[in-house]
Protein backbone atom coordinates (compact mmCIF):
# COMPACT_ATOMS: atom_id res chain seq x y z
CA UNK A 1 0.00 0.00 0.00
CA UNK A 2 1.22 3.50 -0.86
CA UNK A 3 0.43 6.40 1.48
CA UNK A 4 0.87 10.09 0.68
CA UNK A 5 1.18 12.43 3.65
CA UNK A 6 0.78 16.20 3.33
CA UNK A 7 1.97 18.48 6.14
CA UNK A 8 4.72 16.20 7.42
CA UNK A 9 6.44 18.74 9.68
CA UNK A 10 3.45 19.98 11.68
CA UNK A 11 2.55 18.65 15.13
CA UNK A 12 0.29 15.91 13.80
CA UNK A 13 2.28 15.36 10.60
CA UNK A 14 5.45 14.64 12.54
CA UNK A 15 3.74 11.91 14.55
CA UNK A 16 2.04 10.55 11.41
CA UNK A 17 5.45 9.97 9.86
CA UNK A 18 6.07 7.57 12.74
CA UNK A 19 2.66 5.88 12.93
CA UNK A 20 2.14 5.41 9.19
CA UNK A 21 5.58 3.98 8.45
CA UNK A 22 4.58 0.37 9.32
CA UNK A 23 1.22 0.66 7.52
CA UNK A 24 2.52 1.18 3.98
CA UNK A 25 5.11 2.77 1.75
CA UNK A 26 5.06 6.37 2.94
CA UNK A 27 5.82 9.47 0.90
CA UNK A 28 5.76 12.49 3.21
CA UNK A 29 5.67 16.05 1.89
CA UNK A 30 5.51 19.59 3.22
CA UNK A 31 5.50 23.09 1.78
CA UNK A 32 9.25 22.89 1.04
CA UNK A 33 9.26 19.52 -0.76
CA UNK A 34 10.99 19.74 -4.14
CA UNK A 35 10.32 16.55 -6.12
CA UNK A 36 6.55 16.68 -5.59
CA UNK A 37 4.40 19.68 -4.65
CA UNK A 38 3.20 19.70 -1.05
CA UNK A 39 2.37 23.41 -0.97
CA UNK A 40 -1.32 24.01 -0.21
CA UNK A 41 -1.14 27.54 -1.60
CA UNK A 42 -0.89 25.75 -4.97
CA UNK A 43 -4.09 23.68 -5.45
CA UNK A 44 -3.15 22.59 -8.97
CA UNK A 45 0.26 21.51 -7.74
CA UNK A 46 -0.97 19.30 -4.90
CA UNK A 47 -3.65 17.77 -7.14
CA UNK A 48 -0.96 16.98 -9.71
CA UNK A 49 1.06 15.28 -6.95
CA UNK A 50 -1.89 12.98 -6.28
CA UNK A 51 -2.28 12.17 -9.98
CA UNK A 52 1.45 11.46 -10.40
CA UNK A 53 1.87 9.29 -7.32
CA UNK A 54 -1.56 7.61 -7.40
CA UNK A 55 -1.43 6.63 -3.69
CA UNK A 56 -3.92 4.25 -2.10
CA UNK A 57 -4.37 6.61 0.85
CA UNK A 58 -3.82 10.36 1.22
CA UNK A 59 -3.47 11.77 4.73
CA UNK A 60 -3.80 15.54 4.92
CA UNK A 61 -2.23 17.12 7.99
CA UNK A 62 -1.61 20.45 6.21
CA UNK A 63 -3.72 23.48 7.14
CA UNK A 64 -3.78 27.16 8.00
CA UNK A 65 -3.99 26.79 11.79
CA UNK A 66 -3.10 30.33 12.97
CA UNK A 67 -6.59 31.10 14.27
CA UNK A 68 -6.11 34.81 14.97
CA UNK A 69 -4.01 35.45 11.86
CA UNK A 70 -6.75 33.90 9.70
CA UNK A 71 -9.02 36.83 10.60
CA UNK A 72 -6.74 39.20 8.67
CA UNK A 73 -5.94 36.82 5.79
CA UNK A 74 -9.21 34.99 5.03
CA UNK A 75 -8.29 34.40 1.37
CA UNK A 76 -5.14 32.49 2.34
CA UNK A 77 -7.03 30.51 4.98
CA UNK A 78 -9.67 29.58 2.39
CA UNK A 79 -6.97 28.57 -0.10
CA UNK A 80 -5.15 26.30 2.36
CA UNK A 81 -8.13 24.92 4.28
CA UNK A 82 -10.71 24.50 1.52
CA UNK A 83 -9.61 25.16 -2.07
CA UNK A 84 -6.63 22.80 -1.98
CA UNK A 85 -8.64 20.20 -0.07
CA UNK A 86 -11.20 20.28 -2.88
CA UNK A 87 -8.45 19.88 -5.48
CA UNK A 88 -7.01 16.87 -3.66
CA UNK A 89 -10.47 15.35 -3.16
CA UNK A 90 -11.23 15.53 -6.89
CA UNK A 91 -7.86 14.03 -7.82
CA UNK A 92 -8.29 11.28 -5.22
CA UNK A 93 -11.72 10.43 -6.58
CA UNK A 94 -10.24 10.10 -10.07
CA UNK A 95 -7.51 7.74 -8.86
CA UNK A 96 -9.63 5.80 -6.33
CA UNK A 97 -7.69 6.89 -3.26
CA UNK A 98 -8.92 7.28 0.30
CA UNK A 99 -8.49 10.72 1.88
CA UNK A 100 -7.97 11.20 5.62
CA UNK A 101 -8.46 14.81 6.70
CA UNK A 102 -8.41 16.67 10.03
CA UNK A 103 -10.93 19.29 11.05
CA UNK A 104 -11.86 21.12 14.22
CA UNK A 105 -14.43 21.77 16.93
CA UNK A 106 -14.35 25.39 15.69
CA UNK A 107 -17.01 24.44 13.13
CA UNK A 108 -19.46 24.67 16.07
CA UNK A 109 -20.67 27.84 17.84
CA UNK A 110 -19.25 26.69 21.19
CA UNK A 111 -22.46 27.17 23.16
CA UNK A 112 -23.92 24.95 25.90
CA UNK A 113 -22.14 22.28 27.90
CA UNK A 114 -23.01 19.06 26.06
CA UNK A 115 -20.39 17.35 23.86
CA UNK A 116 -21.03 18.03 20.18
CA UNK A 117 -22.08 15.12 17.99
CA UNK A 118 -21.23 14.70 14.31
CA UNK A 119 -24.88 15.32 13.40
CA UNK A 120 -25.17 18.64 15.27
CA UNK A 121 -25.66 21.83 13.26
CA UNK A 122 -22.49 23.78 12.55
CA UNK A 123 -22.06 27.54 12.98
CA UNK A 124 -18.41 28.68 13.07
CA UNK A 125 -17.46 31.74 15.11
CA UNK A 126 -14.37 32.72 13.12
CA UNK A 127 -12.60 32.57 9.75
CA UNK A 128 -10.58 29.51 10.72
CA UNK A 129 -13.75 27.58 11.60
CA UNK A 130 -15.54 28.72 8.44
CA UNK A 131 -12.68 27.66 6.16
CA UNK A 132 -12.25 24.31 7.91
CA UNK A 133 -15.98 23.65 7.51
CA UNK A 134 -15.69 24.53 3.81
CA UNK A 135 -12.85 22.00 3.56
CA UNK A 136 -14.99 19.30 5.14
CA UNK A 137 -17.79 19.93 2.68
CA UNK A 138 -15.40 20.00 -0.29
CA UNK A 139 -14.08 16.56 0.66
CA UNK A 140 -17.54 15.12 1.37
CA UNK A 141 -18.88 16.40 -1.96
CA UNK A 142 -15.99 15.21 -4.13
CA UNK A 143 -14.54 12.02 -2.66
CA UNK A 144 -16.80 9.38 -1.05
CA UNK A 145 -13.82 7.39 0.28
CA UNK A 146 -12.95 9.79 3.09
CA UNK A 147 -12.36 9.91 6.83
CA UNK A 148 -12.74 13.33 8.45
CA UNK A 149 -11.54 13.60 12.04
CA UNK A 150 -12.64 16.68 13.97
CA UNK A 151 -10.32 17.23 16.89
CA UNK A 152 -9.53 19.90 19.46
CA UNK A 153 -6.88 21.34 21.80
CA UNK A 154 -4.07 19.51 19.98
CA UNK A 155 -0.61 19.44 21.54
CA UNK A 156 2.68 17.67 20.88
CA UNK A 157 6.05 17.36 22.55
CA UNK A 158 7.69 18.71 19.40
CA UNK A 159 7.74 22.49 19.05
CA UNK A 160 5.86 24.99 21.17
CA UNK A 161 2.78 24.07 23.17
CA UNK A 162 0.57 25.32 25.99
CA UNK A 163 2.43 23.36 28.68
CA UNK A 164 5.84 24.73 27.65
CA UNK A 165 4.49 28.28 27.58
CA UNK A 166 2.93 27.89 31.03
CA UNK A 167 6.14 26.45 32.48
CA UNK A 168 8.24 29.26 31.04
CA UNK A 169 5.90 31.87 32.53
CA UNK A 170 5.70 30.04 35.87
CA UNK A 171 9.49 30.21 36.17
CA UNK A 172 9.42 33.98 35.54
CA UNK A 173 6.31 35.15 37.38
CA UNK A 174 4.76 34.73 40.82
CA UNK A 175 1.19 35.24 39.58
CA UNK A 176 -0.54 33.88 36.49
CA UNK A 177 -4.12 34.23 35.25
CA UNK A 178 -5.50 31.48 33.00
CA UNK A 179 -8.90 31.16 31.30
CA UNK A 180 -11.40 28.92 33.10
CA UNK A 181 -14.56 29.19 30.96
CA UNK A 182 -13.44 27.29 27.86
CA UNK A 183 -13.93 23.52 28.09
CA UNK A 184 -12.28 20.78 26.06
CA UNK A 185 -9.93 17.80 26.07
CA UNK A 186 -6.21 18.27 25.39
CA UNK A 187 -5.46 15.75 22.64
CA UNK A 188 -1.97 14.55 21.79
CA UNK A 189 -0.72 14.48 18.21
CA UNK A 190 0.67 11.06 19.15
CA UNK A 191 -2.85 9.78 19.91
CA UNK A 192 -4.28 11.25 16.70
CA UNK A 193 -1.53 9.64 14.65
CA UNK A 194 -1.94 6.21 16.23
CA UNK A 195 -5.73 6.32 15.84
CA UNK A 196 -5.32 7.37 12.20
CA UNK A 197 -3.04 4.44 11.40
CA UNK A 198 -5.55 2.04 12.94
CA UNK A 199 -8.53 3.68 11.22
CA UNK A 200 -6.88 3.40 7.80
CA UNK A 201 -6.43 -0.34 8.20
CA UNK A 202 -10.07 -0.71 9.26
CA UNK A 203 -11.36 1.45 6.39
CA UNK A 204 -9.51 -0.53 3.74
CA UNK A 205 -11.25 -3.70 4.93
CA UNK A 206 -14.60 -2.07 5.82
CA UNK A 207 -15.20 0.83 3.41
CA UNK A 208 -18.60 1.43 4.97
CA UNK A 209 -16.86 3.23 7.86
CA UNK A 210 -16.18 6.20 5.56
CA UNK A 211 -17.46 9.47 6.98
CA UNK A 212 -17.12 12.16 9.63
CA UNK A 213 -15.88 11.47 13.17
CA UNK A 214 -15.03 13.30 16.37
CA UNK A 215 -11.63 12.30 17.73
CA UNK A 216 -10.31 13.70 21.00
CA UNK A 217 -8.94 12.30 24.25
CA UNK A 218 -11.36 11.36 27.02
CA UNK A 219 -12.56 13.68 29.75
CA UNK A 220 -12.89 17.45 29.95
CA UNK A 221 -10.91 20.29 31.50
CA UNK A 222 -10.35 24.05 31.28
CA UNK A 223 -7.15 25.88 30.35
CA UNK A 224 -6.84 26.87 34.03
CA UNK A 225 -7.08 23.29 35.28
CA UNK A 226 -4.80 22.10 32.47
CA UNK A 227 -2.19 24.62 33.63
CA UNK A 228 -2.64 23.52 37.26
CA UNK A 229 -1.88 19.92 36.30
CA UNK A 230 1.24 21.03 34.42
CA UNK A 231 2.51 22.91 37.47
CA UNK A 232 1.74 20.01 39.83
CA UNK A 233 3.67 17.59 37.62
CA UNK A 234 6.58 20.02 37.33
CA UNK A 235 6.86 20.37 41.09
CA UNK A 236 6.70 16.58 41.52
CA UNK A 237 9.60 16.36 39.08
CA UNK A 238 11.64 18.74 41.23
CA UNK A 239 11.35 21.76 38.94
CA UNK A 240 11.51 25.09 40.77
CA UNK A 241 8.74 27.53 39.86
CA UNK A 242 8.45 31.18 40.87
CA UNK A 243 4.67 30.84 40.70
CA UNK A 244 2.75 31.19 43.97
CA UNK A 245 -0.71 32.22 42.71
CA UNK A 246 -2.77 30.80 39.82
CA UNK A 247 -5.90 32.81 39.09
CA UNK A 248 -8.94 31.72 37.09
CA UNK A 249 -10.27 34.36 34.69
CA UNK A 250 -12.95 34.53 31.96
CA UNK A 251 -12.19 34.54 28.23
CA UNK A 252 -13.03 38.26 28.18
CA UNK A 253 -9.84 38.93 30.15
CA UNK A 254 -7.79 38.09 27.06
CA UNK A 255 -9.40 39.65 23.95
CA UNK A 256 -8.28 38.06 20.66
CA UNK A 257 -8.99 38.87 16.99
CA UNK A 258 -10.81 35.54 16.56
CA UNK A 259 -13.66 34.50 18.86
CA UNK A 260 -13.06 31.25 20.75
CA UNK A 261 -15.78 28.67 21.51
CA UNK A 262 -16.61 28.13 25.16
CA UNK A 263 -17.68 24.53 24.62
CA UNK A 264 -15.12 22.47 22.69
CA UNK A 265 -16.36 19.13 24.05
CA UNK A 266 -16.72 16.49 21.31
CA UNK A 267 -18.70 13.25 21.58
CA UNK A 268 -16.44 10.41 20.36
CA UNK A 269 -18.85 7.47 20.73
CA UNK A 270 -19.16 6.97 16.96
CA UNK A 271 -15.38 6.78 16.47
CA UNK A 272 -14.85 4.38 19.38
CA UNK A 273 -17.69 2.15 18.20
CA UNK A 274 -16.79 1.99 14.49
CA UNK A 275 -13.06 1.53 15.02
CA UNK A 276 -13.23 -0.56 18.21
CA UNK A 277 -10.91 1.70 20.18
CA UNK A 278 -10.95 3.26 23.64
CA UNK A 279 -9.79 6.87 23.80
CA UNK A 280 -7.74 7.41 26.99
CA UNK A 281 -8.34 10.25 29.43
CA UNK A 282 -6.56 13.47 28.47
CA UNK A 283 -4.38 13.45 31.61
CA UNK A 284 -2.59 10.29 30.47
CA UNK A 285 -1.16 11.84 27.31
CA UNK A 286 -0.32 15.16 28.93
CA UNK A 287 1.54 13.52 31.82
CA UNK A 288 3.46 11.32 29.39
CA UNK A 289 4.45 14.35 27.31
CA UNK A 290 5.51 16.23 30.45
CA UNK A 291 7.61 13.31 31.69
CA UNK A 292 9.43 13.24 28.36
CA UNK A 293 9.96 17.01 28.55
CA UNK A 294 11.32 16.84 32.09
CA UNK A 295 13.73 14.00 31.33
CA UNK A 296 15.04 15.19 27.96
CA UNK A 297 18.48 16.73 28.09
CA UNK A 298 19.16 19.47 25.56
CA UNK A 299 22.43 18.68 23.83
Swiss-Prot record:
NADPH binds at residues 11-12, 39-40, 63-65, 102, 128, 132. Binds 1 Mg(2+) ion per monomer. Mg(2+) is important for dimerization. One of its GO terms (cellular component) is cytosol. The record marks 104 as: Could provide a fine-tuning to achieve optimal pKa matching between active site and substrate. Its cofactor is Mg(2+). InterPro entries: dTDP_dehydrorham_reduct, NAD(P)-bd_dom_sf, RmlD-like-bd. The keyword Cell wall biogenesis/degradation does not apply. Changing residue 104 to A: Loss of activity. One of its GO terms (molecular function) is dTDP-4-dehydrorhamnose reductase activity. NADH binds at residues 10-12, 30, 39-40, 63-65, 128, 132. The active site is at 128 (proton donor/acceptor). It is an enzyme of class 1 (oxidoreductase). Pfam families: RmlD_sub_bind (PF04321). DTDP-beta-L-rhamnose binds at residues 104-105, 153. Changing residue 67 to A: Significantly reduces enzyme activity. CDD domains: dTDP_HR_like_SDR_e. Involved in the biosynthesis of the dTDP-L-rhamnose which is an important component of lipopolysaccharide (LPS). Catalyzes the reduction of dTDP-6-deoxy-L-lyxo-4-hexulose to yield dTDP-L-rhamnose. RmlD uses NADH and NADPH nearly equally well. Homodimer. NCBIfam families: PRK09987.1, rmlD. Belongs to the dTDP-4-dehydrorhamnose reductase family. This is dTDP-4-dehydrorhamnose reductase. It comes from Salmonella typhimurium (strain LT2 / SGSC1412 / ATCC 700720). The gene is rfbD.
